[in-house]
């Protein structure tokens, strides 16, 4: 629909006779992702007409970086963009202009300027080239951020905190020196561009330094959290063939020390490509030496001996590579087999994160950004990219419910640990999973109240939540608990894009239950099963590179097979046509997502096959989330072998083994014996349908499910009714 017609609708109201005639004869096209709304004099959108509950508006939107960017675009191109919707519409209909302006405004350090941003005529698939001809280094952009207010060498770049009370304040100068020494150690091991360097590490400063040193050489970084079991780690790392592995000696979580090196020893014997293993002394007083083994010739080094390999005179250098050179490998959930290895390039990661930090979130140099995450989750990569915007990055390693006031204090269980850390360190932007905030809400914690925490939280400008949908009641709770001044950014994206589709905006109101806006440069719509755009109706719909020899075909089949030429992300969403906000309804496939942690059923099946094949004939693992549930529950249905009996002892053994081999996050909440596992004609387990049945979403119809043993679906229906 033409912009002037959208203006008419805004002026006269969408329910007026004239507006209805315009909408009938001018239906929106796929490029019309948001209608134009006339702003007030302060740059803010007006009150939505549908009676939505507004919880926050920016007090001075014209002081933000997004407003400055909008004015820069207006001046350069002679536009009169006034609202976020105007800016977003321009960003997706003039993508070359938008990303070129974002490159300039956000500040990308490079040794060669791009020849072309992107071919405007190119479709999403086959994947077009971006910023062709440019050469840069990702680590250089984080260590020497190109921002209007230059950071001081003596300013704090990183604050690393652990559950035991340790505080490590690292200046920009010190961070660069630490990366230099780590890079020198890698050079001694002859690490080259495109080599893979892996971390079996927690969220601490040495992990960040190792990543930056890896990226500085043009090598590729990947990480697996040390709470992941041996099978889970090997399933991922064996595919990428790392040359170098960093590992923690131990981690502290929930008040306990968890040694890591026993698992590390098993992992390295399964990685024939490995040439060296470096042990980081993350927990003092715990084994640090990794004994040699004839099963793996990889060199064993402590972190200090690794650093000592490189000459002290070696300068910090940055290997400049093509803009899309691989930077990170992350992993899919493993729903249909071994987790897929998802490759992310330097410029895509850097541009998306700087856009989201500077424009969408208004993060400024000197702000202090903290997100509770592991190194394996994409939010760690999002967090550490805050350095590129000149922010101080706060790394927290441990349970968010343990707190020690200082390095001399005693760690104790404390539900208000993170709010206390906000006050102690002056954190300005704090983020965690939606489950974390809903847990605080259920426990009725009010950290600023006189009867509880007596905290001020006065430095806090924004709160971010992601991982699963945030309930409207939790929106209200966050404003009650953390203060009316915060921009609540309920954000949504994915490991697949290492970025966000739904983001904050300082030019838009926060509405209870809604993600504020669709991100700039992202043409997001909600499509129905037939490919019809449901965005303007408000109906639910679907939110529309892998490593290895079959990466391109996996990429296409995973994201472009459902709607040819259009990315199908697999999220079930609504778009509010009045506000432009997104409402997340959950996953639209069978991926398990308890407490915001995504993983696949295949990982559970692997453990059962390896450890319980003598007792369990088959199994089905699904997520259950009924209308009244605030989170997804993982349910494991098992079919016993004919001569075997089900018992509670077996269920406990399965839980214990899953916890050890994969992680505590993988442990099913319920393990139930069932008479039969539904399968299709080609033997595929019917997970998605069973998930819908046990969640109360769909009653199985006879003959319509594609299940060869469809009669057994009735058992799942009866179980769901009774439980």
UniProtKB/Swiss-Prot annotation:
One of its GO terms (molecular function) is ATP binding. SUPFAM superfamilies: Acetyl-CoA synthetase-like (SSF56801). It comes from the Eukaryota. Its EC number is 6.2.1.-. Viridicatumtoxin and its derivative, viridicatumtoxin B, exhibit anti-methicillin-resistant Staphylococcus aureus (anti-MRSA) activity. Moreover, viridicatumtoxin and a C2 acetyl analog, spirohexaline, have been demonstrated to inhibit bacterial undecaprenyl diphosphate synthase, a potential new target for antibiotic development. The keyword Heme does not apply. Gene3D superfamilies: 3.30.300.30, N-terminal domain of ligase-like. InterPro entries: Acac_CoA_synth, ACAS_N, AMP-bd_C, AMP-bd_C_sf, AMP-binding_CS, AMP-dep_synth/lig_dom, ANL_N_sf. Keywords: ATP-binding, Ligase, Nucleotide-binding. Malonamoyl-CoA synthetase; part of the gene cluster that mediates the biosynthesis of viridicatumtoxin, a tetracycline-like fungal meroterpenoid with a unique, fused spirobicyclic ring system. The first step of the pathway is the production of the malonamoyl-CoA starter unit for the polyketide synthase vrtA. The aldolase vrtJ may be involved in the synthesis of the malonamate substrate for malonamoyl-CoA synthetase vrtB. The polyketide synthase vrtA then may utilize the malonamoyl-CoA starter unit, followed by sequential condensation of eight malonyl-CoA units to form the polyketide backbone. This is Malonamoyl-CoA synthetase vrtB. It comes from Penicillium aethiopicum. The gene is vrtB.
């Amino acid at each position: 629909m033409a912009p002037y017609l959208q203006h008419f609708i805004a002026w006269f109201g969408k329910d007026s006779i004239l507006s209805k005639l315009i909408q009938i004869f001018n239906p929106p096209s796929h490029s019309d992702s948001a209608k134009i709304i006339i702003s007030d004099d302060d740059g803010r959108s007006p009150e939505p007409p549908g009676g939505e509950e507004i919880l926050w508006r920016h007090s001075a939107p014209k002081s933000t970086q997004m407003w400055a960017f909008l004015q820069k675009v207006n001046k350069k191109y002679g536009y009169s963009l006034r609202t976020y919707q105007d800016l977003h519409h321009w960003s997706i209909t003039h993508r070359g202009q938008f990303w070129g302006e974002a490159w300039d405004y956000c500040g990308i350090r490079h040794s060669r300027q791009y020849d072309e941003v992107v071919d405007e005529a190119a479709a999403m698939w086959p994947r077009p080239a971006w910023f062709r001809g440019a050469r840069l280094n990702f680590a250089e952009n984080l260590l020497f951020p190109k921002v209007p207010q230059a950071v001081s060498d003596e300013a704090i770049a990183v604050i690393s905190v652990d559950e035991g009370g340790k505080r490590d304040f690292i200046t920009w100068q010190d961070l660069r020196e630490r990366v230099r020494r780590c890079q020198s150690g890698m050079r001694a091991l002859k690490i080259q561009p495109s080599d893979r360097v892996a971390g079996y590490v927690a969220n601490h400063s040495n992990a960040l330094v190792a990543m930056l040193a890896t990226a500085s050489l043009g090598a590729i970084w990947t990480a697996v959290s040390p709470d992941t079991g041996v099978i889970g780690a090997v399933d991922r790392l064996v595919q990428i063939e790392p040359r170098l592995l960093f590992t923690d000696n131990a981690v502290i979580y929930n008040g306990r020390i968890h040694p890591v090196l026993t698992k590390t020893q098993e992992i390295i014997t399964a990685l024939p490509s490995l040439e060296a293993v470096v042990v980081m002394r993350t927990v003092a007083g715990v084994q640090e030496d990794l004994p040699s083994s004839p099963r793996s010739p990889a060199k064993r080094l402590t972190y200090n001996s690794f650093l000592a390999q490189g000459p002290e005179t070696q300068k910090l250098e940055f290997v400049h590579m093509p803009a899309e050179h691989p930077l990170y490998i992350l992993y899919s959930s493993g729903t249909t087999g071994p987790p897929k290895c998802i490759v992310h390039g330097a410029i895509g990661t850097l541009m998306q994160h700087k856009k989201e930090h500077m424009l969408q979130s208004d993060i400024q140099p000197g702000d202090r950004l903290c997100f509770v995450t592991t190194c394996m989750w994409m939010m760690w990569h999002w967090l550490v990219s805050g350095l590129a915007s000149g922010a101080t990055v706060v790394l927290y390693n441990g349970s968010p419910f343990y707190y020690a006031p200082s390095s001399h204090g005693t760690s104790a269980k404390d539900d208000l640990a993170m709010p206390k850390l906000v006050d102690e360190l002056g954190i300005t932007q704090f983020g965690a999973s939606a489950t974390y905030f809903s847990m605080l809400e259920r426990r009725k914690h009010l950290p600023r109240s006189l009867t509880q925490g007596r905290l001020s939280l006065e430095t806090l400008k924004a709160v971010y939540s992601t991982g699963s949908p945030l309930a409207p009641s939790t929106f209200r709770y966050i404003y009650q608990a953390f203060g009316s001044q915060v921009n609540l950014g309920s954000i949504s994206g994915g490991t697949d894009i290492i970025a966000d589709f739904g983001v904050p905006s300082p030019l838009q109101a926060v509405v209870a239950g809604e993600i504020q806006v669709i991100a700039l440069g992202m043409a997001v719509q909600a499509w129905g099963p037939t490919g019809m755009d449901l965005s303007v109706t408000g109906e639910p719909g679907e939110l529309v590179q892998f490593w290895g020899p079959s990466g391109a075909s996996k990429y296409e089949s995973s994201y472009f097979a459902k709607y040819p030429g259009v990315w199908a992300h697999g999220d079930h969403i609504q778009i509010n046509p009045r506000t432009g906000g997104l409402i997340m309804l959950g996953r639209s496939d069978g991926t398990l997502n308890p407490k915001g942690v995504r993983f696949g059923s295949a990982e559970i099946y692997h453990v059962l096959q390896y450890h319980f094949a003598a007792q369990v004939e088959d199994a089905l693992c699904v997520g259950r989330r009924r209308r009244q549930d605030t989170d997804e529950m993982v349910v494991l249905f098992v079919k016993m072998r004919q001569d075997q009996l089900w018992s509670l002892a077996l269920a406990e053994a399965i839980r214990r083994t899953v916890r050890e081999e994969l992680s505590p996050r993988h442990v099913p909440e319920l393990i139930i014996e069932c008479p039969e596992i539904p399968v299709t004609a080609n033997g595929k387990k019917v997970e998605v349908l069973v998930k819908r049945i046990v969640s109360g979403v769909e009653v199985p119809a006879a003959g319509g499910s594609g299940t060869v043993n469809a009669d057994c679906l009735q058992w799942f229906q009866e179980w769901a009714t009774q439980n």
